[in-house]
Amino acid sequence: MVKVNLAPVPYSIEVPAEIAKHLSIENMITSTPSEFTNQAREAGAIAQVYINYKAADGTMHGFAGVYYFKKADFEKAQNPDEPPVYGSKVVEENSMVVAIAGPQDSIFDPNSQDGKNSATLYTLVYDPNSFKSS
């Protein structure tokens, strides 16, 4: 397993080396600011990153968003009548939360290597044991 640093989220995620080489981390605030990233920041998101996946054909795909919140701010941002805006809480530590948003479905053929990698990565991003505080 290889640690992939999620900075500025103060965690890394451990993934198999053959998957890690396909990943890049993009700071949402500095590289792709949008109305949504501004809304997340106003809701209390301390850090926001995308996990991007580079497919075998060289195309880059957004895989998941990672959000780092104070627990109280994350809970305040939730509406029980709607899907979670900033994803699902995966790690809660020291009154802080790491939440993951996405992916909904794989865009890859499940029998392809990219499809298999995507399925493995999906399992890992929702497993609290995959994350290590940095």
Feature annotation, model-predicted:
Residues M1-A45, Y50, F74-S134:
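N-terminal targeting sequences that direct proteins away from the cytosol to non-cytosolic compartments
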Residues A55-P83:
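Short, conserved beta-strand/beta-arch hydrophobic-aromatic motifs that form part
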